């Protein structure tokens, strides 16, 4: 696995992206040489490099929205190849819509774009097919040993088994408890104790050892783990691989050390200041652009009868500060007179207009005011009402380290409706975001949000 700034990224996903970049470059070169009116292709490319870079960025964005950087897909299947071809041409349409009405970007004409689009769609589909032929068998077979057959080790084993094709194949446990050695734990054998690692690793062809020990490590265990690196084997701790697999924090199996590191990281200060400036700028722009939509929504809500246009509810923000979140009212007036409760599917309290407004996410637009006031950000954990029953969730209160957002990591990775039962799981996603916060992770959330909205999946 790779870690680029704050984001865990699979090397297979990086390989897909690099392959697409090569396909795009080749498609441009092919188009320049096939275009009959082209006299000096390299000079033309140099003079219009910004235009070609912009077009390439649009292609990559559309492919991401189409979920075509999912390296677990088998692109040998005809429907997945058709999926690739469809979205490569959607990318072409997006280029035309964005740059070619009414004129053109740089000096890249429409005819040249057709040559490039045909070349790119054929190349990227061929690359995806080749990727699956070569890489699909390889990525299923990374054999691992789990050091620790206790709760943390079993927790990791369950996460791997729940994600077929994730790229990891547990071979067995290693544990220093003599009563466990030689037994079967959750269907996996305990092959020996930690002192046997130098023998077990080559014997079972193990390239990766995972230390799933939450208690204090003994001197013997520490010495055995150090020896792992001496025999050309990678050593990684359980929380890191669990984060990579699930996009969550294993709250029951981590210490408080990460939060101390977060607080002393000076780069976070500059990130938060720049993010505030971006939030402020974008909020002003979006308020201006969406003002007609806000007016129409307000009129439609008013047409259903009397009652306030906006729904205000107390939420807990950064550093525990309580604020009123602003939404368009989508329920009957007085729907929460008996106190707030979770919204269910087909909730009878939701009005006809409100149902449409919620489906299109238009009820979130007034939260631009919360962003202007500095109470929220575009991206961050969703603001929740104060609830004493949630304080028993490990690290729940750490959510207030950052500003709440309109969309967040929990919403794009766990897109089902929020209920009391799902809150602990969503908090794990929120904590992952806080621990790994950064612009790259924000960009990933933004792109995943666009994908969810485009395909109509819930938050």
Can you name each region flagged by the protein language model?
Residues 178-181, 242-252, 310-349, 406-430:
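Short, glycine-rich, amphipathic interfacial segments at transmembrane boundaries or analogous
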Residues 29, 34-36, 40, 131-248:
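A solvent-exposed beta-alpha-beta segment
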Residues 270-334, 370, 439, 444-459:
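A hydrophobic, helix-centered structural microdomain
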Residues 246-285, 309-313, 415-439:
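Glycine-rich flexible loop motifs, especially short His-Gly-Gly/GGXG/HXGH segments used as catalytic or interaction
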Residues 1-140, 144, 168, 459:
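Signature of alpha-helical transmembrane segments in polytopic membrane proteins
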Residues 84-88, 140-159, 308-331:
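Membrane-cytosol interface motif
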Residues 343-404, 445-449, 453:
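A short, structured surface patch at a secondary-structure boundary
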Residues 351, 373, 395-459:
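C-terminal terminal-structure detector
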């Amino acid at each position: 696995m790779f870690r680029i700034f704050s984001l865990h990224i699979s090397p297979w996903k990086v390989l897909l992206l690099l392959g697409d970049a090569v396909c795009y470059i080749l498609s441009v070169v092919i188009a320049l040489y096939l275009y009959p009116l082209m006299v000096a292709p390299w000079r033309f490319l140099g003079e219009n490099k910004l235009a070609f870079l912009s077009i390439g960025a649009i292609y990559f964005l559309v492919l991401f929205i189409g979920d075509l950087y999912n390296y677990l897909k088998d692109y040998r299947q005809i429907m997945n190849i058709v999926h690739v071809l469809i979205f490569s041409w959607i990318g072409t349409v997006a280029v035309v819509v964005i740059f070619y009405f009414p004129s053109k970007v740089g000096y890249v004409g429409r005819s040249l774009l057709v040559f490039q689009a045909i070349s790119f769609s054929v190349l990227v589909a061929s690359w995806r097919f080749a990727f699956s032929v070569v890489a699909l068998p390889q990525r299923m077979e990374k054999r691992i040993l789990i050091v620790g057959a206790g709760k943390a080790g079993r927790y990791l084993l369950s996460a791997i088994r729940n994600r077929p094709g994730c790229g990891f194949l547990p071979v067995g446990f290693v544990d220093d408890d003599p009563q466990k050695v030689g037994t079967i734990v959750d269907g996996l054998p305990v092959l020996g104790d930690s002192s046997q690692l130098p023998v077990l690793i080559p014997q079972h062809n193990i390239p990766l050892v995972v230390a799933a020990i939450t208690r204090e490590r003994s001197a013997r265990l520490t010495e055995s783990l150090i020896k792992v690196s001496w025999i050309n084997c990678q050593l990684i701790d359980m929380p890191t691989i669990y984060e990579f697999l699930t996009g969550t924090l294993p709250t029951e199996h981590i210490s408080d050390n990460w939060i101390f590191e977060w607080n002393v990281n000076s780069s976070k200060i500059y990130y938060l200041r720049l993010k505030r400036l971006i939030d402020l700028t974008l909020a002003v722009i979006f308020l201006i652009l969406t003002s007609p939509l806000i007016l129409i929504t307000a009129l439609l809500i008013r047409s259903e009868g009397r009652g306030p246009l906006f729904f205000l509810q107390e939420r807990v923000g950064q550093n525990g500060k309580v604020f009123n979140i602003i939404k368009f009212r989508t329920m009957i007036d007085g729907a929460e007179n008996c106190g707030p409760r979770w919204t269910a599917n087909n909730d009878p309290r939701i009005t006809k207009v409100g149902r449409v407004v919620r489906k299109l996410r238009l009820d979130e637009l007034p939260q631009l005011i919360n962003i202007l006031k500095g109470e929220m950000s575009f991206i961050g954990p969703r603001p929740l009402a104060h609830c004493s029953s949630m304080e028993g969730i490990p690290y729940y209160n750490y959510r207030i380290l950052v500003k709440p957002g309109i969309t967040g990591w929990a919403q794009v990775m766990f897109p089902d409706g929020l209920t009391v039962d799902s809150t602990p799981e969503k908090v794990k996603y929120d904590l992952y975001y806080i621990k790994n916060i950064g612009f790259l992770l924000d960009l990933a959330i933004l792109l995943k949000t666009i994908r969810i909205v485009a395909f109509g999946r819930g938050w």
